[in-house]
Amino acid sequence: MTNPLYHKHIISINDLNRDDLESVLHVADKLKQHPNSQLLKDKVIASCFFEASTRTRLSFETAIHRLGASVVGFADGSNTSLGKKGETLADTISVLRTYADAIVIRHPQEGAARLASEFAGDIPVINAGDGANQHPSQTLLDLFTIKETQGRLDNLNIAMVGDLKYGRTVHSLAQALAKFTGNHLYFIAPKVLAMPEHILHLLEEHGVEYSQHETVDEVMSELDILYMTRVQKERLDPSEYANVKAQFILTSADLVNVKDNLKILHPLPRIDEITTDVDNTPYAYYFQQAGNGIYARQALLALVLNKNLVL
């Protein structure tokens, strides 16, 4: 039976239905047990990062190597023909499709990954983050981590805290959780950084329960997952950043009356929104979460490049 993700562009988490998500998580679990497979031997993956990245780029490249493939690309778009000579993204992708079997792209402009897919032909494009829009591979590792720690993706109380306006990770995660049942999402942010209306409307269309708050204290005791985010200085004007950067800081003292199964996640990098004393609590799981990025991205690459994947 042909794998439905074969040669599929992964631009938005909404490109994947629940069955697709569960397939990726199943393969990720198998690869976590046996990470050094050769599922992509002799394949070449283009890693094109037009925007700064540490974890996403390095975990993708680690995933590529562990699958037996080779990686070509760049970590600084300003040193490419697009950055130096004014080449269009369309032309860049039209050339890269002749070099590689798949293209992983991060770009500061919303919609850039979708545009790239339109010029890639049958070469799958994986969005590694486009502006404040989507970050589907981060969402897959988030879902994998939630399932790993909670044993399920349904009937959970999940809080997302901090920058919900510009944070592409929470946009994608909220949309993904809408594909599962019985979850309650708590959105905790200052009004200036609230979850965008189009995300709220999507949740309403799917019958997802959610509530909005300005402090985490009122819901902390109910939570299974606390998903912290940093206030993104690079996407705010200085006065706006100064007003909100210290509004949501989690310390170990905040974790007194929490559920035993609570896990704290964060897409990283952390600045000062989680103090280091939280790291040594049994609830901190953000470094393990980052490590899971390798397996989720291995699974995604293996599925889009293997017509009949059996594990």
Curated annotation (Swiss-Prot):
* EC id: 2.1.3.2
Q: Check the record and name the InterPro entries matching this protein.
A: Asp/Orn_carbamoyltranf_P-bd (IPR006132), Asp/Orn_carbamoylTrfase (IPR006130), Asp/Orn_carbamoylTrfase_sf (IPR036901), Asp_carbamoyltransf (IPR002082), Asp_carbamoyltransf_Asp/Orn-bd (IPR006131)
- Tell me what reaction this enzyme catalyses: carbamoyl phosphate + L-aspartate = N-carbamoyl-L-aspartate + phosphate + H(+)
Recite the UniProt keywords alphabetically. Answer: Pyrimidine biosynthesis, Transferase
Q: Which PROSITE patterns does the annotation name?
A: CARBAMOYLTRANSFERASE
Pathway membership: Pyrimidine metabolism; UMP biosynthesis via de novo pathway; (S)-dihydroorotate from bicarbonate: step 2/3
Per the record, the GO terms for biological process are: 'de novo' pyrimidine nucleobase biosynthetic process; 'de novo' UMP biosynthetic process; amino acid metabolic process
One GO MF term on file is:
aspartate carbamoyltransferase activity
Q: What Gene Ontology cellular-component terms does the record carry?
A: cytosol
Q: Which top EC class applies here?
A: transferase
Listed binding positions for carbamoyl phosphate are 55-56, 106, 135, 138, 268-269
Binding residue positions for L-aspartate: 85, 168, 230
Q: Which domain of life is it from?
A: Bacteria
Tell me, how does this one assemble? Heterododecamer (2C3:3R2) of six catalytic PyrB chains organized as two trimers (C3), and six regulatory PyrI chains organized as three dimers (R2).
Concerning its family, UniProt says: Belongs to the aspartate/ornithine carbamoyltransferase superfamily. ATCase family.
Question: Function, please?
Answer: Catalyzes the condensation of carbamoyl phosphate and aspartate to form carbamoyl aspartate and inorganic phosphate, the committed step in the de novo pyrimidine nucleotide biosynthesis pathway.
Q: What is this protein called?
A: Aspartate carbamoyltransferase catalytic subunit
To which species is this protein native? Answer: Proteus mirabilis (strain HI4320)
Gene behind the chain: pyrB
